[in-house]
Amino acid sequence: MSNLLRVAVSKQKRRYQKNGYDLDLAYITDNIVAMGFPSEKVEGVFRNPMKDVQRFLDQYHKDHFKVYNLCSERVYDHSKFYGRVGYYPFDDHNAPQFEMIDAFCRDVDAWMKEDSKNIAVIHCKAGKGRTGLMICCWLMYCGMWKNTEDSLRFYAALRTYNQKGVTIPSQIRYVGYFGRSIRESIKYVPRNVTLKKIVLRPLPKEINLSEVQFNISVGKNCVFNSKEHNMNVVISKKKKTVVDKNKKDPKKKLTKENSEKNIDSQQQQQSQSSLSQSQQGQSSPNMQSLSASGTISSGSNVGTVNGNTLHQLGGSQFSLSDLADGNTIGNDEYISFEIGALSLAGDIRIEFTNKQDDRMFMFWVNTSFVQQLEIIPKSGLDKAHKDKNHKAFPEDFHVELTFDQLDQQQSHTTVVASAEEQTNNQHYPQSSNNVATSSSHHDNITVVASDAPQNNNNNNNLNSSNSNNATTTTTKNNISLASSQSNPVQQESNPSTTTQVSEENSAPKVEAEKIENSNASANDSETSSNSSS
């Protein structure tokens, strides 16, 4: 029963199921292992039992393993792994501090160089997203892969059955950042920038924009909350006329939505009329425009600017503007939050919520990699990227971040790696049994990787010389994988998959297992997920 629970919890992740073990664990290379959290007590029933993980590592990699815990939400006594534990914590479904990635890679690098038998065992809670981010960065750090997308696809193929390895857009973006820093030999220095404006374009659906809120954090420290700051916020909406095709009279039949718009328009005209009689409002530097359908639920009118009514909500003001049909200049719908001048540096998280603080979407960016106009598409927004049917956000929805003029010299310092550093970075692909070659940057990737443990105690392979190899051919559309890690569920549903066990310590081999790449091609964030660059 416990084994069934573990398989259910691990979902599409590859498991180590041989030699008496059933662990949420996969060899990404000969010396890099990804696994789920080593758990105790009740949690050990459906996750990796701590005792089984200890026994596995002692049996196959005694004195030659170091465990890396990426969980910020849970820890364990480091003595359980003889004190050989690296701790690089960051929150689930979030990106790490950029400096932490480099520190992690240097730690693994130092450990690997101590002994050729040494392995790194890396885990978060599920052992997939955060774990994959760090492993993909390491694969580029050590020189095994140069391209971000190739590294992500390689990890996805070796860790999962459905090719969904690192799936959180912000985490993918940070793999891209790190890949760029490696390729361009960038010595990272946080850049100070000034955020001026955030634009959501087109307007999100199924939400009253008067309830849209957002906060901006540097790391975990919130530095701006829209609920506590007055802003100049503008909504631009198209005017639409609905015609009854039967009677051809636009006044005969209107949709509920447009009826509400007409009522709102009348209310605005009445408000403008009364205001013009009582007072003339002036343009305020702190305006706020917040309404999805033009409906103002509360507040009072304070004046007009360029023919648009200004409204008061709390301490803020906002304006509404309509775009006439056929307008060729700016003929789209958007909401613009003009923040003014917010100084930022380093890892930035921006989260949009509704009035009940339910998350709409969020994303992480690093100021050293942004453009002056940073455009993040829907596919690059955490949570919003899951809206495949475009119910909450239009298909072309995106976020625009406008920064003040950026000092490119301040962004980072470029250094040329020394001959010794270049040699060290080439150490792993040459010395490892894992060979990774890219025959075409965009078409085919052929990798040979081992998932079977080696008993470093007696320096003997547990398997025959070739039985532990997994050959993966990755194309733009699919991944063909021959792996020694078998999925019993898929074996039942795929009659073409065969498993052969030659002896007790031999790994079963799955021959020519075809796996559709349902994750398509991961977004290569090497250009900061920026469509403007």
Swiss-Prot record:
CDD domains: PTP_PTEN
One GO BP annotation of this record: negative chemotaxis
Topology class, membrane: Peripheral membrane protein
Pfam families referenced in this protein's UniProt entry, alphabetically: PTEN_C2 (PF10409), Tc-R-P (PF22785)
EC top class, as a word: hydrolase
Matches recorded under SUPFAM superfamilies: (Phosphotyrosine protein) phosphatases II (SSF52799), C2 domain (Calcium/lipid-binding domain, CaLB) (SSF49562)
C2 tensin-type domain ranges (all copies): 271-406
Subcellular location: Cell membrane; Cytoplasm; Cytoplasm, Cell cortex
EC number assigned by the record: 3.1.3.16, 3.1.3.48, 3.1.3.67, 3.1.3.-
Biased composition (Polar residues): 410-439, 479-505
Knockout consequences: Growth defect. Failure to aggregate. Slower migration. Leads to increased F-actin polymerization. Unable to suppress lateral pseudopod formation and turning. Having a direct on PI(3,4,5)P3/PI(3,4)P2 levels. Significant increase in chemoattractant-mediated activation of pkbA and a decrease in chemotaxis speed.
Entry annotated with the keyword Lipid metabolism: yes
Principal localisation: membrane
Comp. bias intervals (Low complexity): 265-298, 455-478, 517-533
Active site residues per record: 124
Enzymatic reactions: a 1,2-diacyl-sn-glycero-3-phospho-(1D-myo-inositol-3,4,5-trisphosphate) + H2O = a 1,2-diacyl-sn-glycero-3-phospho-(1D-myo-inositol-4,5-bisphosphate) + phosphate; O-phospho-L-seryl-[protein] + H2O = L-seryl-[protein] + phosphate; O-phospho-L-threonyl-[protein] + H2O = L-threonyl-[protein] + phosphate; O-phospho-L-tyrosyl-[protein] + H2O = L-tyrosyl-[protein] + phosphate
Keyword GTP-binding applies: no
Cellular component terms (Gene Ontology): cell cortex of cell tip; cell projection; cell trailing edge; cell trailing edge membrane; cleavage furrow; cytosol; equatorial cell cortex; nucleus
Domain of life: Eukaryota
Annotated spans, Disordered: 235-298, 410-533
Protein name from the UniProt record: Phosphatidylinositol 3,4,5-trisphosphate 3-phosphatase and dual-specificity protein phosphatase PTEN
Gene expressing this chain: pteN
